[in-house]
């Protein structure tokens, strides 16, 4: 449903319209050829979870070339020069990780779990490929769920520092954000705010049920408005958590 899609922006060129949107907590880019009226999604790679972006080259709207940005939880930021007409791309810039980085060492999963009222909530899980899924790992579960802010699954070198130590990083795309459109935000604000808290608690329970971790081994994390979330969930379900960062 369109009410579960967030339009992030539109870029107009002489021959093309580029639309960015978010649905099911996944960021996407679509390109429409104005002369043929054909629209296609720009597919960056075989990764399911990533963050795309687009910028004009010298603000030239007569061009067929644009800069495309790309990153994912396991792939550092990259910038490509992309030709919309022949679909060729050239790598222009790539984020350097001084300590070295091999994206194949990491596994990124996108799952959904049922919350207290049956709504399906997206969850992004990033872990080292050597981390065992037997309930022994600690999980850092990040959440925000406020002001319609979506938690895009981008790259973070500091996050990988934890993941390299066998800590699983999970981001719960809970209600109050706009990962599933305007309705997702409205279902997590004002008198519906309890949905934000319940979504997060059910994310923790899902991670325990699926043996990513065990009860009492989850570190909850949320800052600013996410601090309200942390205060609520640790008081509602203290047995789930090893600690709270806020």
Residue ranges and their predicted role:
Residues 2-20, 48-69, 109-110, 156-160, ...:
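Conserved beta-propeller blade repeats
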Residues 23-25, 60-62, 73-74, 117-120, ...:
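Short flexible coil/turn linkers enriched for glycine and charged/polar residues
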Residues 28-30, 78-80:
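A short loop-to-beta-strand structural motif that recurs across blades of beta-propeller domains
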Residues 1-7, 11, 34-56, 85-105:
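Multi-bladed beta-propeller domains
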Residues 18-25, 32-33, 67-73:
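Beta-strand C-termini and the immediately following turn/loop, strongest in propeller blades
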Residues 45, 69, 82-88, 92-219, ...:
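Cap/lid segment of the alpha/beta-hydrolase catalytic domain
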Residues 232-243:
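Conserved hydrolase catalytic core segment
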């Amino acid at each position: 449903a369109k009410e579960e899609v967030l339009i992030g922006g539109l870029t107009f060129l002489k021959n093309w319209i580029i639309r960015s949107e978010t649905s099911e907590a996944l960021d996407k880019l679509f390109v429409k050829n104005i002369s043929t009226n054909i629209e296609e999604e720009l597919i960056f790679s075989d990764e399911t979870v990533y963050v795309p972006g687009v910028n004009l080259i010298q603000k030239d709207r007569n061009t067929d070339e644009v800069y495309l940005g790309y990153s994912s939880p396991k792939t550092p930021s990259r910038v490509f020069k992309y030709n919309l007409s022949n679909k060729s791309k050239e790598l222009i810039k790539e984020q350097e990780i001084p300590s070295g980085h091999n994206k194949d060492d990491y596994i990124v999963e996108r799952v959904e779990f049922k919350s207290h009222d049956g709504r399906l909530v997206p969850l992004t899980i990033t872990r080292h490929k050597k981390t065992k899924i037997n309930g022994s790992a600690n999980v850092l579960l990040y959440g925000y769920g406020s002001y319609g802010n979506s938690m895009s699954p981008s790259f973070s070198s500091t996050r990988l520092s934890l993941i390299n130590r066998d800590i699983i990083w999970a981001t719960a795309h809970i209600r109050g954000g706009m990962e599933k459109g305007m309705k997702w935000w409205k279902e997590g604000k004002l008198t519906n705010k309890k949905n934000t808290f319940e979504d997060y608690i059910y994310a923790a329970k899902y991670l325990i049920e699926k043996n990513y971790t065990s009860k009492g081994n989850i570190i909850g994390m949320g800052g600013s408005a996410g601090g309200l979330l942390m205060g609520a969930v640790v008081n509602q379900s203290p047995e789930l958590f090893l600690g709270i960062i806020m």
